[in-house]
Amino acid sequence: MTSGGGYGDPSQKIDYVFKVVLIGDSAVGKSQILARYARDEFSLDSKATIGVEFQTRTLVIDHKSVKAQIWDTAGQERYRAVTSAYYRGAVGAMLVYDITRRQTFDHIPRWLEELRAHADKNIVIILIGNKSDLVDQRAIPTEDAKEFAEKEGLFFLETSAFNATNVESAFSTVLTEIFNIVNKKSLAASEDQENGNPGSLAGKKIDIVPGPGQVIPNKSNMCCNS
């Protein structure tokens, strides 16, 4: 269970570091989602992200300290050159579209294809329909996105960075899933050691940033209703 909604203590011991990337078209609200989660801020004057930036937030999951390292890059085509470095070591991804702009949802399969080409094959992915506060401007029915997420084996939520709806839940869903996968791997390694098998990770701090090896759960368990 995720707890400790604070924004981190510099002196706190870190048990895990999870790299999560935000991807999607420009102006869907990726930077706003990150600002809301990392600093609980929202600015109507937010400018397009140029290049790459990342922010961190430390939280507690099952009594373990987890640092989320969240990367954000602009969605314009001219920044595609950063992709391989951007995706390297990521164990979670947030695939964001704007519920008021149909083309941003239509581009999601392309973003997903790029993600799967560059990232670890077992990366934990959540599809996010942002700007859910703009109900009267909705262009993508929730059911369409939910159906796509189920077909592709993704988590799904609709969020609003403006009023903070489901922003915490979206990050919590991804980070908790990664944590559970890592814990299962650690437990399996510990059992191997007890059985005299080599290659155990027991007793070691597991830093996930260099490269994951998760197993995605069954699709039937992966879609989170908004």
Curated annotation (Swiss-Prot):
Gene3D superfamilies: P-loop containing nucleotide triphosphate hydrolases (3.40.50.300)
Ranges of Polar residues composition bias in the record: 217-226
Lineage top rank: taxon: Eukaryota
Main localization of the protein described in the UniProt heading: membrane
InterPro entries associated with the record: P-loop_NTPase, Rab_GTPases_membrane_traffic, Small_GTP-bd, Small_GTPase
Alphabetical list of Pfam families matching this protein: Ras
Cellular compartments per GO CC: plasma membrane; plastid
Name assigned to this protein: Ras-related protein RABA4a
Source organism: Arabidopsis thaliana
Lineage start: Eukaryota, Viridiplantae, Streptophyta, Embryophyta, Tracheophyta
GN (gene name): RABA4A
